[in-house]
A protein has these predicted regions:
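Phosphate/oxyanion-binding loops and surfaces in catalytic or ligand/nucleic-acid-binding neighborhoods
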Residues: 6-7, 67, 115, 170
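Short, structured beta-strand segments at or near domain termini in extracellular proteins/domains
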Residues: 161-176
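Short capping motifs at secondary-structure boundaries
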Residues: 1-12, 47-48
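Functional-site microenvironments in short loops/helix caps that host divalent-cation chemistry
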Residues: 15-152, 156-161
Length: 177
């Protein structure tokens, strides 16, 4: 990974029984996980992008269409999203095209929670690590987390099997890739 070789990110953090899939070519189309917020942001910066804000993420998921989920208002099922442990792990990017947003953006619900640029603020966070908002739910989360307006938060220093990211780009930066 370019991010690791340029020393902007540390190698993925593996815990327990999860396979070191980033080292296996069979998993090259899977989301990057076990990555902290800062490492995700560094990765995006190396590729001339940034993490999306929560508003940008919701726009890509289709919030302006007045829908509950990226694919519409139909209740989640396992043809639309990877959630609730059904697939017993992660699925490759684009595995469930029926769950695409109105803009054709894939994997906006389920598989991995996605870091956003936005910090989470609560009265309970008394000077500890900065918490960051994650969107989309994960392969181990309940269906309610798949709603476009739902969110979760974790310490920006944390990394886990259910946390990943996507980068956003300006029109100018796309031509430079």
């Amino acid at each position: 990974m370019k991010c690791v070789t340029e020393e902007k990110c540390t190698p993925p953090h593996y815990r327990g029984y999860f396979e070191k899939y980033t080292e296996n070519i069979l998993y090259r189309n899977y989301p990057i996980t076990y990555i902290s917020w800062q490492e995700a942001e560094n990765y995006c910066e190396i590729h001339q992008g940034t993490l999306p804000t929560e508003s940008q993420w919701m726009a890509a998921a289709g919030i302006t269409f007045g829908i509950r989920y990226p694919w519409g208002d139909e209740e989640p099922n396992f043809a639309l999203a990877n959630y609730d442990g059904f697939y017993q792990g992660l699925t490759p990017a684009g595995w469930l095209p029926q769950g695409a947003s109105p803009y054709g953006v894939l994997d906006m619900a389920g598989n991995v929670r996605e870091w956003t640029l936005d910090p989470y603020s609560s009265d309970d966070n008394m000077g500890g690590d900065t918490d960051r908002i994650l969107k989309g739910g994960s392969s181990s989360d309940y269906p309610q987390t798949l709603e476009i307006t739902a969110f979760q938060w974790h310490s920006e220093k944390s990394a886990g099997f259910n946390r990943g990211f996507r980068c956003v780009y300006t029109a100018d930066s796309v031509g430079t890739k």
